[in-house]
Structure formats: structure tokens, C-alpha cells
Amino acid sequence: MFLEINFYSTFFQRRPSLWKERCKFEEVDAQGNSISYSHHPPDLTGQRSPLTPTTMRIVDRIPTVVGFRVIPTTVLVLLTYLTIFTLVIVTDWLPEPPKNQNGLDLKQAYTDLRHITAHPHPYNSHYNDAVHDYILSRVRPVAASTSFVHISDDQTSNGSWASPGYGVYFEGTNILVKIDGKSSNGNDGVLFSAHYDSVSTAPGATDDGMGVVTLLQLIDYFAKHRPDRTAIFNINNGEEDWLNGAHAFLQHTWSNLTDTFLNLEGAAAGGRPILFRATSTSPVRAFRSDYVPHPHANVISSDAFARGVIRSGTDYEVYTGAGAEMEGLDVAFYKGRSRYHTKYDAVPYTNGGERSLWAMMETAQGAGNALLNAKRHKQDQGSGGTPVYFDLVKAELVIFYLNDLLIYNVVSLVVGPISLIFFVVCEYVLRNERARQPNGHPVSRPSVLEWLKQRSWLRALWRRSKFWIALVITIALQALLVWGYLAFNSFTVYSSPYLVLISFFSLAYLSLVIPLTFTFNQTQSPTAKYIAPEREKHTLLIQVYIFTWILLLFSTIAVARAQVGGLYFVTAWNTGVWIACLLAAVEGMMLPVPQGGPRVRFHSAHHHHHHEHEEDQDADDDDREQRQPPTEATPLIGYSRASLRKPQEGGVVGWWIVHLLLTIPAPVLLIAQMGSLLLDSLPQTLADGSPAYVVYAAASLTAVLLAVPLTPFSGKLHRGLFFLFFLSFLIVTAYLWLAFPFSSADPLKVFFQQKVTLSNVVSERHSSIMGLSNSTVHPTAGVRKVVTAITGTPYYLKNEIIPRLPSASGKELKCRDEKAKRGLVTCEWESTLVPSPGGRNPWEDDFAAAQGRVGATSKSRQSWFKAEVARTGVRKGQIVLQGRNTRSCRLYFDSRPIIKYVVEGGHEGMQKGYEVGKVGASEVRLWSRTRDREFVVDFEWEDDDGREGEGITGRIACEWVEYESGNLDNGDGQWDLQRGGGERAKIPAFEEVLAFLPEWAVASKTTDGLVEAWSPFSV
């Protein structure tokens, strides 16, 4: 601005006659009244401009390019946001596997993956044995050729453990590999864990086939590159049935050799694996870019797991729980949860394919090398070592202690406001000292009445409050939009999370920028016009600082009371805005001070009344005028917009760029990364019963936090952005409210189970013990009722899915709210599609001998299990149970919980830290490594209300998971269907679901068994 004035001063020096001919002055007093008069130009004799006209033209363009003006500000803000969003998106893409695979063999791993995931292979299936044998065949040659590699095919470990409400007895079939370290002290080994069982409804490519084949590669690698510490590989079985394989590992002697673990898991359908959870800072250091080429980690995922936002469980919970108390890492896939535990968790449907597998292998190798060979940091253990961690565009990992974050936050809460107040006061004092008229006297102040008439108090009040008004409007409109999504199409975020974010962000931009750019009309001097945008920006910077200070206060409380580490971005944001405010105060000390006395305006004699154009046109006109060299016919000052700038076109060169770089890139990058993680992991948890409002609130909060950093610069953003965001909001929101939310790529998940009620054939007899009665459930008890139950989201389940199933046609549908999966309903109906347990009937010979006729064979096909129940004491009982072609049975105690149970032949006592609690156990889950195993369970209960001697009632049940389409021979040669003899297991109702579900829906399991057959008992 001053450079332009200097240019015209030089021009008038060379042609002073033109001044008198073509110019006159207009004086404006303090009340805004104008007085016009003619005047001669100042005496410029002897003054020479140090710049030539050509140089002046170059210098004049500097404010246009880097000044705090509309075009430069808009361009830089857009470039900043687009660069950050592009980085977040592009760095999340999976790169092609390198040719140099650092001792790993991706091709072999992919071959292993296809073998392991050829069929669903849950613990209670025949194909589970085939997978076990295949893995064993892969590791045995390694142990045979290397002296420090040892294998344990664990067929002996068993135990009992309890969780709130239920108890477990489990017999493990884990495959353990030990690689002796070069300098291990005996108990500082590292555990590598993955599970080779899948759920009954999925082949398990990502859950957890990729984890298993990664461990196979690490075994080969560390056998050739012996580590410093001992490595234990637990390729366990039974994780899907509530983490049983990890519990079984704790029963093995090798569990005493480890104090750190790396667990590989899959909670989705591929993509890039993330460090989901970590116990302490020391193991997280293994994820630094020195070891892991593309670290992907964020502590917010750990916060989400801890608070039940993501309903899932991994072996991490066992390894960190009572009895183990190890420190370690949980690495898992998280994208595409709609395919999790479904038929789409298969090799052909994996998100990323070989690239996804390589990402897991590369991550595990890097972290494993660090854990086995890097120096330990024992000081990190304990509460002081709780970590805060996040990656920066998959290139670097930032790690620090949660306690350090707390200390820094507390200091910032105190030092920040005090220092800022000091700088602002200094700015005010210095500006008042400089605010004097040319004669040195203080500037005259208008009277109170004049001040009120001028409404400058109203302008000042609006300038200092409009940020908060805009924020309140934004929050209200965001809440209204959340309600709109919940009311019109609550599942639209399921398949279009990023469109939902665009909708929220567009609205946030509009609701913030429109109030902030509203101003009162006022008459300003050229100097005031010059500094007005800067003062506006400074005011908004302070408002944003106050906003981040409030966020920092709540963040500090969350860190101190709830150990929430995911709010680290607030700390970074507050620090950046604080520094920007300090610099703004320094800038304010240097800005020209608008004078309160008469102000002079210049007008051309030929254009006394000049109408200002719109801001963008004004800037373009200036550029054209500055490109034209002056001549004698060139219009004088009246045609130069330099002295008639609108307030929006003022601004100091350079300062605003520093402010922008301090306040926008860091918080926007951190928030964008966090928002991307939330939008990739949360939306499809709606099918699991997660509240929809939580997902939309997360998207809304992300959008608002992304928009707030640009508010100090809102006055200089081009009006075209308003129309762009307005149109995008209308179009995107309308589409999302009308679009069908599911597709074959993002199917809605429903949960299946069939229940078979057996006839209660009980024979009464008297026991020699206290004359108490006993009962027997005969193996030939007939099927009394078969009920098919499907769980899912209420509207689509009742109106779009169940009506498509032939077996449900014309049947009475009974629906109830699901307690285990809140937000979902279970609808059931009686079915004529009767399942068959398959296998060989273990009681066929006994039944034929008892009946003395061949006809018993046909009746034996109805057999499911055999059970005997006896009262062995006042508060004691015994159940003998044998299921047909199954490894899994259950005991339900409906009338009262039991306080103790013991399984004959099992490990004595309960696992340390997992004893039956005070509330007792209403259910006991029994798992054996062999089929047709006879369980003998002794149990005790407490009397209620002193009613000693009363018995107990409940149900005896067994589970089945195999169905024909899941066991088809695919020619891989891995499994002989008839190895156990007998018939094939059949679940025709599940086959019906697979055949008749719409293409936008997919089936998963409700619980451990797809079929549960049960019969009541009392004792």
C-alpha cells in the first residue's frame, strides 16, 4: 500500500502541473462530514524515488500475490486443505510389495493362506484338524534343520476359567514354536500370537489366516537370523470361542518364558493393519519408522476399545490380564467390517489381496526384530509408561508418555493465558502511545453520545462475539443434521462415510463463515481500511485460542481421570494458536494506527463520484491498472484503488501466512487422520448394534473441528467457496437421505442360529446318596421343536430379509430385543428344516443291543447327545454328558447360578485370576479336543434365602457348526470328509439363508454354535 503511494508521489514530482488541473482534496472530520477544497501538491522538489517504474511495477504486485487479500488467502487455504487431505488418502493406499522382501517369502505365504482358508474351520469342525496338520507340516522341517528351534504340538494343556456370568473348560490344541535367543535370561522372551481357527461362517482370510501365515514366515526368518531374545510362537486354536487358545497357552510351561507379546489379529477384511492397542511405551517403540517402514498407529483406537465403542475381543485381553500381565501390542486389520465373520472374509474378497498380506508381514517383521533385538526400556513399565502414539501419514511414529501430555497440558492452561494477556496489554499500550495527531497531542475522543450514535460499541461487541455466535449456530445445525440422518436414513453412513463427512463439513463451513463475514457499514480512513482485516484476524485468533483453551481444559480432565490419550490433537492445536496469537500481538505493535482526526480522500476531477466494484472485480482492475505504465494522459489518484481500498483488501504482507501455517496444517492433519480412522472403522459396526448417533456424532465432530481452524481467515475467503459448499451440501445430503445404504461390497450383516428342543424323556430313580433323585436324558430323545432365529437391525430384518426366506412364509414371527447385541432384534419362527449332527452315532450299538432289533438304527439318527444328571449332595450335583459328532457342549443353570464346577480329568482348580466370582456362573461351556468326548462335571450351588435342600433346574445342550456347503471338497487334498466315518452334518436352514438372502445382505454366526440342541433337566 505504501509502495503504491510512493509510486504516485514520484509520478507527481515529474508532472506537478497535472496535480492542480485534475485533483482536489476532500477532508472528512471525526463525525464523517466531508469538506471538499482545491489544493496545490506538496513540494516534492529535490526528492527522487529510489525505484524505477519497472521495479515499482514488480514491487507493486507483491501485495497482490502474498498480501492478506482474497485471492492469495483463498488459494493458500485451499492448497493447505487439499494437500493434507490428499496426503491422508494417498498414504493410506497399499503399495506394491517390493522385489527385495528382506528374507520373507510373500509367494509362499500366499500359498499357505489359500490352503488354510479353503473352508471355514472353527474349533468344532473337522477341517480345523486339517488346518492344524498343515501348519504342523510347515514348521516341522524348520525345527528338524535347526538346533535352537523347538516345537510343541500341545495335546495336553487344559484348564478352567471364568468370566462374569459363565465358566469355561477347554482342551487346547495349540502349535507352539520356540526359537532360543542368543542372550536370553530365561524370562524376557517375546510371544508372537495368532489363531488358526475361524468362525463357522467364514474361511478366515484376515481373521486370522494372514496372521498365521505371517507367523510361519517369521519362524522361517528367525530360524535363519537368530534373535537375541527367545521367541515363542503361539499359533493357537479356539480364539473365536472367547479367547480359549490364549488361556490354554497360559497352562503351558513356555508361557513363563515371555514378558512381551505381539498379537496379530483381523477385525475386518484387509487393508493396512493398525496398531490397535498397546500396554506401555516400551513396546510401542518397536513401531518406529526405524523398524516398521510404514507405521500405522493411533491411540484413539485403544480408547475406543476400552470404552466399548468397538465390540470385539482379542487375545490381547488374556495376555495383559491376570495370570499373564505381559506388556505388548495388538495389531489388526480394521477396514471393511461388513465382511468380518462372513463368507466374504475369503482370499478373493480381501481388501488389498497380496498387498494387504505384505503390509502385515512387513509390520510384524519390523516390530518383531525390534522387540527381540532392541534395548529394553524398563522405566516405561507401569502407569508412568502409558503411551500416546500416532503416525504422521504412515511415515513417522510420534510417541510420548501420557503423563508428559498431562504435565504439558497443565502448564499450557496456566502459562498460555498469562503470556497472551501480557502481550495484548503491551500491544494496547504501545498503540495508544502512537495514536497521536501530527502536532503530538493525543487524539480527541468522541463524546459518549456521539459514540452511541456512531454505534461503534455495537460493532466492537459484534467483532468480539460473532465467533461464539457462529459456533453456537454451527452446533445447533450439526445436531439438526444428525437428527435428519437418523430420521431419514440412519444406515447411509454404512457404505458412504466420506460423503457423510462432506455433508457435515459443508454445513460447518457455511454456518461458521456466513456469521463471521457479516459486518456493519462504517466510514474508515485509508489507514483503517488497511489494518481492518488484520485486526479482524487478530480478534478471531484470540477467540479460537479461547476455544482451544476450553477444549484443552476438558482434554486434561479426560487424561487425568480416564487415561484418554486420543485428545493429543487439542494440545497441538492450542499450542499453534497460542504462538500465532503472540505473533499477532507483536504484529499489532507494528501496524499503522488509524488517526481519529480529519481524514483526507483523493478524488479525480473527472470522476468525483467513484463507485467501488465488488471485491474480486476490484482486485482484477487493480492488476490491469498496475500493468499500464503512467503517461501524461493517465488518470491520477482518483483512478487508483490504492487509496480507496475496501477493508477486505487491506493487509500486511507475510504475517498472515505465518499465522495460517501455525493454526491450520497441524490440527487439520491430526484431525483428518483421526477422522479417517473413525470413518473406516465405526460405520459398519452399526450391524453389530452400535448406536447410529455415535457414528454420526463422530463424523459431525470431525467436520466441525476441521472447519474451525480456517475461521481467522474467513473474511478473505472467496465468495465462490460459499456457493461450492452450498451446492455440495444440498446435493450430497439429498443423495444420502435417498440412497439405499447397502450393496454387495458393503453388505448388511445378520446373525443366524437354529435351536432344537429335544423331548424331555426322564427316568426317575432313587440314589443311594441321601435318597435324592436322578434323571437321564436319552440319546434317542425325539425332536420336539426346531426354531430358526435371525438377529439384525429391526427394519431391514423384518421387512426385507425374513420375508424372502421360504421357511418363514406363513409362520408366526416372534421378535424380541437382543440383550447381547444392543440395538438389534432377534426374530424366530418354527421351522420344518431339521438339522442333522452327522458323524457316527456312538450309542448305536448300545441302543440296538438294548432293543434287540435292527430297527434301532433308524431311530439312532435322531440322537444328539446323551446326558445323566444326579444329585450328589445337599447343594451338589453331577452331570455326565456326551455329544454326537461335536467337541462343544453347554450347561445352563436357569434357576440359580453355581459357585463351583470341576471337570473330571481336567486341570485341578481354576486358572489364576479367572476364578468364579461372587455372582456365580449361570453357564458352563465345555470344549474337548476330541469328538464324542464324555464330560463329567461336578458342581455346587448356594441356597437362596436359607431354603436349604432345594434343587436346581436348567438345560443341557450341545453345539454344531458344520454344514454341507462349507465342507465341499474343493480338490485341495487337505481333508478326507469321511475320516471320522458316519454321515455329513447338515444345517438346511442355514443353507436356505445363504441361498435366499438378498445380494446386499450376508450371514454370520450368532454364537459359538450354528445349531444348539437342548433338553431341560432338574435335580
From Swiss-Prot:
Its EC number is 3.4.-.-. One of its GO terms (molecular function) is metal ion binding. Gene3D superfamilies: Zn peptidases (3.40.630.10). The active site is at E239 (proton acceptor). Glycans are attached at N158, N256, N774. The record marks Y340 as: Transition state stabilizer. Zn(2+) 2 binds at D207, E240, H341. Residues 91-404, 488-497, 561-565, 673-692, 741-1019 are vacuolar. Binds 2 Zn(2+) ions per subunit. Its cofactor is Zn(2+). One of its GO terms (cellular component) is vacuolar membrane. It is an enzyme of class 3 (hydrolase). It is found in: Vacuole membrane. One of its GO terms (biological process) is proteolysis. Residues 603-634 are annotated as: Disordered. Zn(2+) 1 binds at H195, D207, E265. The chain crosses the membrane at residues 70-90, 405-425, 467-487, 498-518, 540-560, 566-586, 652-672, 693-713, 720-740. Belongs to the peptidase M28 family. This is Vacuolar membrane protease. It comes from Laccaria bicolor (strain S238N-H82 / ATCC MYA-4686).
